Swiss-Prot record:
It comes from Dictyostelium discoideum (Social amoeba). This is Discoidin-1 subunit D. GO terms for cellular component: cell surface; cytoplasm; extracellular matrix; protein complex involved in cell adhesion. One of its GO terms (molecular function) is carbohydrate binding. Galactose- and N-acetylgalactosamine-binding lectin. May play a role in cell-substratum adhesion rather than in cell-cell adhesion. May be necessary for the maintenance of normal elongate morphology during aggregation. The modification N-acetylserine is found at residue 2. It is found in: Cytoplasm. The lineage of its organism: Eukaryota, Amoebozoa, Evosea, Eumycetozoa, Dictyostelia. Its main location: cytoplasm.
């Protein structure tokens, strides 16, 4: 399995980190990002990992997000400047930050065996949560770790609406017989990042037919991120003086 296409929470500063304890002010969660290294010229940058001040199974580091995320994978790494690492751990998570669940009912997940090798664990099924926590169970010398959480990209719905797409008076649908259409180009107010879905509805119909069967339609064609063609059409003996429609366009970005 691969992390390609997934979002790194710590690497992109998309979460808040909190820990049970910190060894001191330069051994905190701020040093917990995967592959973090200090400058090596002084002690200001601190340890190359988060290090707990208490060494027991009650320690944790938790990542909290503003909105729920779909977690796919967790990566673990040891402390880069000392022989300290977590050899096994469990995962807990919460959707509301009140009720917490244990991944695999709290079963141990294999950790790392050295300072710098990154070990990924892909979840059996994606975890939907706002917060997720690593709870070390066993360790080498001290509880110290660097980590990363991988999630699916967050998509939000972007919608634009438009009105008064008009065929014009006495349009081409008002003459002839059989299948006829009028195409009206429509430009969005702003360009979408991805291809939208477009829905149309009539807000004015001015037509007649000798058989009292009104046959008209409207549909989008040639949809792009910048606009589309609005196609008004009729068939048989219908005479359509004019049609007008509105649209709603929605995309996930």
């Amino acid at each position: 399995m691969s992390t390609q296409g997934l979002v790194t929470l710590l690497g992109n500063a998309q979460c808040h980190l909190r820990t049970s304890t910190n060894y001191n002010g330069v051994h905190t969660q701020f040093n917990a990002a995967l592959n973090y290294k200090n400058k090596g010229t002084n002690t200001i940058d601190g340890s190359e990992a988060w290090c707990s001040s208490i060494v027991d199974t009650n320690q944790y580091i938790v990542a909290g997000c503003e909105v729920p995320r779909t977690f796919m994978c967790v990566a673990l790494q040891g402390r880069g400047d000392h022989d300290q690492w977590v050899t096994s751990y469990k995962i807990r998570y919460s959707l509301d930050n009140v009720t917490w669940s244990e991944y695999r009912n709290g079963a141990a997940i294999t950790g790392v065996t050295d300072r710098n090798t990154v070990v990924n664990h892909f979840f059996d099924t994606p975890i939907r949560a706002r917060s997720i926590a690593i709870h070390p169970l066993t360790w080498n010398n001290h509880i110290s770790l660097r980590c990363e959480f991988y999630t699916q990209p967050v998509q939000s719905s972007v919608t634009q609406v438009g009105a008064d797409i008009y065929t014009g008076d006495n349009c081409a649908l008002n003459t002839g017989s059989g299948k006829r259409e009028v195409v009206v180009p429509v430009k969005f107010q702003f360009e979408f990042a991805t291809l939208p879905k477009v829905a149309l509805n009539f807000d004015q119909i001015d037509c007649t037919d000798a058989t009292n069967q009104t046959r008209i339609g409207v549909q989008p064609r040639n949809i792009t991120t910048k606009g589309f063609d609005c196609v008004f059409y009729t068939w048989n003996e219908n005479k359509v003086y004019s049609l007008r429609a509105d649209y709603i366009a929605t995309a996930l970005e």
